[in-house]
Amino acid sequence: MISSRQKLILKAIIDMYSEKGEPVGSKALMALPYLNYSSATLRYDMAVLEELGFLEKMHTSSGRVPSERGYRYYIEHLVTRDNDVTEVFPLIDEVFSKKALGREHTIKEALKLLTDLTSYTAVAVGPDILQSHIKRIEMVPLGLKDAVMLIVTDTGHVQHQQIHISDDMRMDDIKEVIHTLDDLLKNRTLEDALKVLKEEYAISELNQFMSYQSQIIDSFIEAFSKFASDSFYLSGMTNAFEQPEFNDVSHMKRFIDMMDRREIVKLIGTAEGISVRFGSDMEIKPLNQMTIISIPYQIDSKQKGTIALVGPSRMSYQKVIPLLEYIAANLAKLYKDNNKET
């Protein structure tokens, strides 16, 4: 489709535009040792790339900037990994070496480091919580009048819900209800578990504990609702507002609302390998000139999560991609190690 020389020119323009944020002209390209061609040759190839839709011409400048199509081609065929990025890998290793502080803490610290290194907004989405399977449900007494119900999933999620035991309730009966729930719901997905609790046979199993049934089921549902918040992590949201793409206050407000409602989760790719979504893909005004680049991390044959960056389309992909890949690999290991321990 395009010649080898035109590929070099396209890559050079995108790399230079990512670094400086200014349109690139033939004079700047001629300064590169591997593009030692005449100005006329470079201008001709730039015009061809523009005609093919890989470049756009700015009205205020004779230089060109990449189009979305140009970025797509670059990411799919031309991008190289910046070897200098490996210099910060020890910082990432240090974050994940402190996993004893808890998975949630480690993920938050990893995202914070990622936003510090890139100045973009970072998002991590854990395994699809609705498809996690219940590994066990158990009760831990806390004195005479309180207990904690623990729900553990096969993906390493642990959620707890405190239960207060009133005077008309017995600890042994509470244990029996939770034991019955464990028998009913073990090895089911969380999504299925909610459906099972509404089915007749589940209700009949619990009817013998009528005075406790409602409270325990309510506690289970409350614990379930907490799982969703545990699988979504966000860092550096205000970094987006430093970008000129967010000069419009209404776009800024919509972006905040979108993050609060977690609409971003629907936009993050779940396919294998690198997924890139540009503004035109998303039809959301705050993201018109933004890009979401995401990479999945595989936990096992069924479970995977995703880590993503939200930034301007002109972000430095050759630096961002290896960072995302390295953190994704560490996240996969973190989940796997956690699963072995639960």
Curated annotation (Swiss-Prot):
Disulphide bridges, residue numbers: none
Native source species: Acholeplasma laidlawii (strain PG-8A)
Family as reported in the entry's similarity comment: Belongs to the HrcA family.
Gene Ontology MF terms: DNA binding
NCBIfam families: hrcA
Functional note: Negative regulator of class I heat shock genes (grpE-dnaK-dnaJ and groELS operons). Prevents heat-shock induction of these operons.
Gene: hrcA
Keywords annotated in UniProt: Repressor, Stress response, Transcription, Transcription regulation
GO biological process: negative regulation of DNA-templated transcription
Source organism superkingdom: Bacteria
Transmembrane helix found in the keyword field: no
Keyword DNA-binding: no
Protein name: Heat-inducible transcription repressor HrcA
PANTHER family per record: HEAT-INDUCIBLE TRANSCRIPTION REPRESSOR HRCA (PTHR34824:SF1)
Pfam family, one: HrcA
